[in-house]
Amino acid sequence: MVKLRLKRCGKKQRAVYRIVAIDVRSRREGRDLRKVGFYDPIKNQTYLNIPVILNFLEQGAQPTGTVQDISKKAGFFMDL
């Protein structure tokens, strides 16, 4: 099963996150299938590759709660 979840990047005390499609059995920093977005909580910036995310959702991927909240703030999950 594939999930859309956050992968931590950046420095200590300066975390940024990539939104990735990853196998459920992989750890947080494990090998991802594809990078589908970016989230910076300090600068409050979000980038979502919407066509790729829709493709993974159609194939049965499940977003985690945090990724779903970030997507709602960006206005993406309003229609779904």
UniProtKB/Swiss-Prot annotation:
One annotated GO biological process: mitochondrial translation
GO terms of molecular function: structural constituent of ribosome
InterPro entries reported for this sequence: Ribosomal_bS16 (IPR000307), Ribosomal_bS16_CS (IPR020592), Ribosomal_bS16_dom_sf (IPR023803)
Coiled-coil residues: none
Subcellular location: Plastid, Chloroplast
Keywords recorded for this protein, A-Z: Chloroplast, Plastid, Ribonucleoprotein, Ribosomal protein
Gene Ontology cellular component terms for the protein in this record: chloroplast; mitochondrion; small ribosomal subunit
Induction behaviour: Transcribed and spliced in green leaves.
Matching PROSITE patterns: RIBOSOMAL_S16
Spans traversing the lipid bilayer: none
Family recorded in the similarity comment: Belongs to the bacterial ribosomal protein bS16 family.
Alphabetized NCBIfam families for the sequence: S16
Protein name (Swiss-Prot/TrEMBL): Small ribosomal subunit protein bS16c
Species assigned in the record: Lotus japonicus (Lotus corniculatus var. japonicus)
Protein's gene: rps16
